[in-house]
């Protein structure tokens, strides 16, 4: 059954554990592992019929390598990547690109969540764009304390498996 909720999701330290990245001499990620529970979370959301769009900062080839290696590339309907867009989150252009690629309209914004690990990029960008923000705060690599009201997430989860019941709850509220 097609779900009403639409999921925009970051990659690094949201699905992929950045501490496991191995880069080549050009800085392209050639290997990385998923966060514990992230593979199951992503495949479950995909199998349940959610539209999942990657919205991430980085190099396109890095994402291709990592998701091919982990066998998860098929879970994303589209990928919006900063290298291609020419700007990083929280830029509106990143979210505009994801909307365009998925044929979404202004009216669809109330059905979109952005899941990410960075209050200054993912959460700020989502909040400024007018979509629901979900912070996954498991990683110690970034400061998770909002410095402005616009960096305060709508929801906070601590590990990938906590996303599933939250997504189901938010989707049910749209039914």
Located regions from the model:
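Asp-based, Mg2+/Mn2+-dependent phosphohydrolase catalytic module
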Residues: 1-20, 31-46, 50-175
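Conserved phosphoryl-transfer catalytic core
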Residues: 24-28
